[in-house]
Amino acid sequence: MQAGKPVLYSYFRSSCSWRVRIALALKGIDYEIVPINLIKDGGQQFSEEFQTLNPMKQVPALKIDGITIGQSLAILEYLEETRPIPRLLPQDPQKRAIVRMISDLIASGIQPLQNLSVLKQVGQENQMPWAQKAITSGFNALEKILQSTAGKYCVGDEVSMADVCLAPQVANAERFKVDLSPYPTISHINKALLALEAFQVSHPCRQPDTPAELRT
């Protein structure tokens, strides 16, 4: 690997990994990917080698500037502080708080309830309804918030950290067959985001570890 080049430990379908891939693309940061398959061999995140990088045994993890950072929002905050152009957090403190609120609603209030480790615990037959309930509950709140904050994107007309979190979560909703018709604001924003190059190149269907049958 090229010395000094950031290295992202990622799984193609991980929405948390996708958040980081979007941010890296938006900020024009060249990086390398090390795929961590969360299914194969019982989950490569449980290997001793990976646990030395991230004791939480989760992706993403980003090696950058001589440190390794786990947790996607911590990574996004670090990238924003060290490479602030283009901005993902507005300068206005109130708008910045709203962006962080939406990001945290998704990253803490929705995604963890339907991630792989939780779904394994609820049993195969309960996974779909469990995930649907978790996402629907969160989207009910998110839709109401976005109705008052959105412009073209989640908070006004500039892409922010909230958008970086939104698109991957909508992809999860689609994968779990959530009816998105009650969420026109979410759907409208997501459509606009997926038209952007940074969201396309970082998409799960275009990653080095994407299975051939899922590539587009």
Swiss-Prot record:
N-acetylmethionine: residues carrying this PTM: 1
GO cellular component: cytosol; mitochondrial matrix; mitochondrion
Record-listed Phosphoserine modification sites: 137, 181
Residues annotated as domain GST N-terminal: 4-87
Cofactor names: glutathione
Catalytic activity reported: 4-maleylacetoacetate = 4-fumarylacetoacetate; RX + glutathione = an S-substituted glutathione + a halide anion + H(+)
Keyword check for Iron-sulfur: no
Residues with the Phosphothreonine modification: 136
CDD domains: GST_C_Zeta (cd03191), GST_N_Zeta (cd03042)
SUPFAM superfamilies associated with the record: GST C-terminal domain-like, Thioredoxin-like
Pathway field: Amino-acid degradation; L-phenylalanine degradation; acetoacetate and fumarate from L-phenylalanine: step 5/6
Keyword Repeat: no
Subcellular location: Cytoplasm
Pfam families for the chain: GST_C_3, GST_N_2
Binding-site positions, glutathione: 14-19, 45, 59, 71-72, 111, 115-117
Post-translational modification as stated in the protein's UniProt record: The N-terminus is blocked.
Single GO term (MF): glutathione transferase activity
GO biological process, alphabetically ordered: cellular detoxification; glutathione metabolic process; L-phenylalanine catabolic process; tyrosine catabolic process
SUBUNIT field: Homodimer.
PANTHER family with a match to the protein in the record: MALEYLACETOACETATE ISOMERASE
Alphabetized NCBIfam families for the sequence: maiA
Function: Probable bifunctional enzyme showing minimal glutathione-conjugating activity with ethacrynic acid and 7-chloro-4-nitrobenz-2-oxa-1, 3-diazole and maleylacetoacetate isomerase activity. Also has low glutathione peroxidase activity with t-butyl and cumene hydroperoxides. Is able to catalyze the glutathione dependent oxygenation of dichloroacetic acid to glyoxylic acid.
UniProt-recorded name of the protein: Maleylacetoacetate isomerase
Source organism of this protein record: Rattus norvegicus (Rat)
The gene coding this protein: Gstz1
